[in-house]
Amino acid sequence: MKTSFSIQAWEEYLYFQTQDKKTLKKINELIKDIERNGALNGIGKPEKLTNNLSGLYSKRINDKDRLVYENDFIVILETVKFFL
């Protein structure tokens, strides 16, 4: 299965490479897990998104960040950061 990143996701991925190795490690684990187990199985509490995000899936990176991706072709759209 091929993995690619949107421009925004790639910029965030590069940020994590220099600023947050723990999060980067988790993102890499999630990508490998998606390749092995598919979109709705495995670690990270996989979730099928709805409404305007229909057709996309997410997995938890940590309590506040999510990895958002497509199913058949892993396209990392973004790592969503939720701020309270």
Residue ranges and their predicted role:
Residues 2, 11-24, 58-66, 70-84:
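Enriched for short, Lys/Arg-rich terminal
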Residues 2-4, 51:
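Basic nucleic-acid-binding interfaces
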Residues 10-13, 31, 50:
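Conserved protein kinase catalytic domain
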Residues 24-32:
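PIN-domain endoribonuclease scaffold, especially VapC-family toxins
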Residues 33-60:
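A short, surface-exposed loop/turn module that caps and links secondary-structure elements
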